[in-house]
Amino acid sequence: MNKRAISATIIDTANELFHKKGYLATEVDDIVNAANISIQEFEETYSSKENVCKQVLKSYSKDLKAEFKKYEENDNTRQRLSLFLDKYFEDAENIAQNGCPVFNLYYDLCNMNNELSELIGEILEMQHKWFDEQFIIMLKTESAVDQGDRLMSAISGLILLAKLTGDAQMFKSQIIQLRSWIRSM
C-alpha cells in the first residue's frame, strides 16, 4: 500500500474504533491490528494517536461542511433541517448501539483542554450555528436562535438516551416528532 492508502486506512479504522470503543480506550496497537498494518507503517504515517484523531476530526468537519452545502441547495429551510434529521433517522440502529461518533468524541475530548478538544468543540459549534441560521431565516428574526438551541439540545439528549437504552425505535419516533415540530413553524 502507498502512504496515501495507508493513511486513509488508518483514519477509517481509527474513526470506527473511536466510535465503538472511545478515544481514551483505543490504543495505537488497536488501530494497527484492526487496520492490518505494521507499527512501522503507522509510525511512518502518523506520529501519534492524537495526530490520527486530528485527521478524523478534520474529516468530520469537512464532511459536515459538505452536507450543509448540499442541504443549502434547497431553498426551504424547513426541508434543510428535515434533511439533516434524516441522517440521524437513517443511522438510528448504529446510534442506539454505539452512540454518535461526533458526540462520543466530544465526551472523550471535551475536558482535555488541547487542540483535540478545540477541534471537536468547533464541529459541534458549527452544527449549532447552522441550526441557528436556519431558524433565523425561517422565522425572520434574530430571536429565533433559541429554536436552534432547542434542536441542538433535543438531538444531544436523544443520542444519549438512545445509546443508554439501545432503543432505535424510540430514537426514530423522536426524530419524526422533531421533523413535525419544524414543519409546524
Q: Where in the sequence are the language-model features?
A:
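Amphipathic alpha-helical segments used for helix-helix packing
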Residues: 94-115
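Hydrophobic alpha-helical connector segments
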Residues: 55, 69-97, 148-151
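Hydrophobic/aromatic residues within well-ordered alpha-helical segments
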Residues: 49, 56, 60-64, 123-127, ...
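Generic hydrophobic, amphipathic alpha-helix propensity
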Residues: 3-14, 31, 56-60, 64, ...
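Amphipathic alpha-helical packing segments from all-alpha helical-bundle domains
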Residues: 113-139, 149, 180
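Amphipathic C-terminal alpha-helical segment
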Residues: 91, 111, 152-170, 181-185
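Helix-turn-helix
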Residues: 9, 13, 17-51, 55
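Short amphipathic alpha-helix in the helical subdomain of ABC transporter nucleotide-binding domains
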Residues: 3, 10, 144-151
